[in-house]
From Swiss-Prot:
<dbReference type="Pfam" id="PF02419">
    <property type="entry name" value="PsbL"/>
</dbReference>
<comment type="function">
    <text>One of the components of the core complex of photosystem II (PSII). PSII is a light-driven water:plastoquinone oxidoreductase that uses light energy to abstract electrons from H(2)O, generating O(2) and a proton gradient subsequently used for ATP formation. It consists of a core antenna complex that captures photons, and an electron transfer chain that converts photonic excitation into a charge separation. This subunit is found at the monomer-monomer interface and is required for correct PSII assembly and/or dimerization.</text>
</comment>
<comment type="subunit">
    <text>PSII is composed of 1 copy each of membrane proteins PsbA, PsbB, PsbC, PsbD, PsbE, PsbF, PsbH, PsbI, PsbJ, PsbK, PsbL, PsbM, PsbT, PsbX, PsbY, PsbZ, Psb30/Ycf12, peripheral proteins PsbO, CyanoQ (PsbQ), PsbU, PsbV and a large number of cofactors. It forms dimeric complexes.</text>
</comment>
<keyword id="KW-0674">Reaction center</keyword>
<protein>
    <recommendedName>
        <fullName>Photosystem II reaction center protein L</fullName>
    </recommendedName>
</protein>
<keyword id="KW-0604">Photosystem II</keyword>
<dbReference type="InterPro" id="IPR037266">
    <property type="entry name" value="PSII_PsbL_sf"/>
</dbReference>
<dbReference type="InterPro" id="IPR003372">
    <property type="entry name" value="PSII_PsbL"/>
</dbReference>
<keyword id="KW-0602">Photosynthesis</keyword>
<dbReference type="GO" id="GO:0015979">
    <property type="term" value="P:photosynthesis"/>
</dbReference>
<feature type="transmembrane region" description="Helical">
    <location>
        <begin position="20"/>
        <end position="40"/>
    </location>
</feature>
<keyword id="KW-0472">Membrane</keyword>
<comment type="similarity">
    <text>Belongs to the PsbL family.</text>
</comment>
<dbReference type="GO" id="GO:0009539">
    <property type="term" value="C:photosystem II reaction center"/>
</dbReference>
<keyword id="KW-0812">Transmembrane</keyword>
<dbReference type="GO" id="GO:0031676">
    <property type="term" value="C:plasma membrane-derived thylakoid membrane"/>
</dbReference>
<keyword id="KW-1133">Transmembrane helix</keyword>
Length: 41
């Protein structure tokens, strides 16, 4: 029972952390690309 409840508990946390990291990375990349594209165009 305890191990079964910690497994589903761990997965959402990892997914949440991964999505958060990807979201920050996306914003970071877009933040760099936006000025670069506006400068070139």
């Amino acid at each position: 029972m305890p191990t079964r409840s910690t497994n589903p508990n761990k997965q959402p946390v990892e997914l949440n952390r991964t999505s958060l990291f990807l979201g920050l990375l996306l914003v970071f990349v877009l933040g760099i690309l936006s000025p670069a594209t506006s400068l070139t165009s």
